[in-house]
Amino acid sequence: MPRPGRATAKILALIACLQCFVVSGSLAAGADQAPEADWPTRAWPVSSPEQHGMKSGVLARLVETVGGYKQNSLLIVRHGKIVLDAYYAPYLPNITHDVRSVTKSVLSTLTAIAIRNGQLDGVEHPVVDMFSDKQIPDIDDNKKAITVQQLLDMTSGIAWQEKSFTPDEAIVRMYQVPDRTAFVLSQPMSDAPGAKFYYNSGNPYVLSALINRKTGQNAFEFAKKELFGPLGITSAGWGRADSQGVIDGGAGLSLAPHDMARIGYLYLRNGIWEGKQIIPSSWVDRAREGKTPATFGFHYANLWWSLPEMDAFMAQGRHSQLILVLPKLDIVAVMTGILRDDQFYPMRRLVDDIASAVKSDGPLPPDAVGASLLEASVREAATERPSSVGITPELVKQISGKAYQFSANALKVKTFALNLIDPDPFWEITTETENADRPTRRFSGILGLHGIFRMSPPANYGINASKGRWLDERTFALERRILGHSETQLWVLAFDGNKVEVSFEDTDGSKAKLYGEKKD
């Protein structure tokens, strides 16, 4: 499946972490015949799985299985109540999480609201007509024919590269120009509009620009008033607007897992919230049915993925961010994670694993043994297991507290220092900036040396968690995360006298080599 999000070389590392706990939900017949909902606008009600026809013992096994896939959280709602709420160490509850391309599905929801409000006149309107002030070369009949619906279905026909996130790809070049909307619409056409599915994060960027143009607000401002406010979503953050005032519609949104579940619950309840039709039920139906055949056996529509044969549809983001809606089971499931692109939990298996816990639409008898197993699984997930640390060499005395200065590099790292002897070991990096008033920027974090992540006090970029270990007598590995970000970062430092070679890698696929020398 195409990888949502972007992978630019980063200096921050990314993280996710700790703690788990369990709960459960109420009772009903399936979303299509659900009784009056117990709306979770202020807080999610919780209950035991058995009260809502699910087996705690099966969910306990699911918590353990999902934990093997480097997830940060797993949440399941049935009949409007949380029946499972687990967090994997070192991730913590209530931390806002980068949801990557789940952003697209939220942007779709905002498009539906703009149509409901009469601010956008419908999905069949030609897109280029609404940007007549843009300088768009080579406008042919195919480009003139692109509609809002085709942007929503990833069938715009615009030629696009979005796979490896290398500098030559359109997705990377888009972020380097001042007018990204014009950039997307200026790309050549590879197919007639509507003819073929092709994943293109430029499509939702143009939709976000339409939100600006038609509502007078950027997507985040519009969402706070029209979507997040009514649903009780309070955790949201959403990147920065570009020079045109447009928020990225393809990525950049952050939500806590409970707020992700609210988005899914809106769709489970056919667009209704507290008796008000927030989005048309037909919009939900189209996402659920998946009108457009996509990749890997999935379907796609309205910026949502679907498996129609399983009656499952989902918002998905890179590194395993997920809002899964199972209408016939009256279930919403949420996952956040830090997985590499080749490590996704198989979606069909996940649907089957969740469904296997459902035994009835009504309550089951209490199950003390199952409840105990589930409680233990959630507690175990929240407890970090120490990793190996290696033997501390004599070299530590020579490098600890010393700063190493680096030649020009892709990460713009100027200096790197490790303090491994202090009672509170820490690392420190300085990087170059393009700001003449502030030419360097400093990052630092407390470092766990006993196989456990240690958390630094919250910074403006989040909560840093780091741990390090010796691979051999001259090689030290530092793993760094920022809780709630969907990437992890690994720095491997190989020391040789006064010199150091640093190998950098993150889960976005960025890699770099840095060469430094000890400062006098």
Regions found by a protein language model. Name each.
Residues I11-S24:
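Bacterial N-terminal signal peptides
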Residues R61-L92, V123, D330-A333:
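A short, well-structured edge-of-sheet supersecondary motif
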Residues G80, H97-V123, L151, L207-I211, ...:
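Active-site SXXK
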Residues P93-N94, K163-G252:
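Catalytic-site signature segments of enzymes, centered on catalytic residues
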Residues D98, N117-I158, S186, T215-A251, ...:
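Active-site helix/loop module of the DD-peptidase/beta-lactamase fold
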Residues N203-L210, G249-I272, Q321-I338, L350:
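Active-site-proximal alpha-helical segments within enzyme catalytic domains
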Residues S235-G237, S281-M335:
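Active-site Gly/Thr loop motif
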Residues P366-D520:
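Peripheral terminal and inter-domain segments
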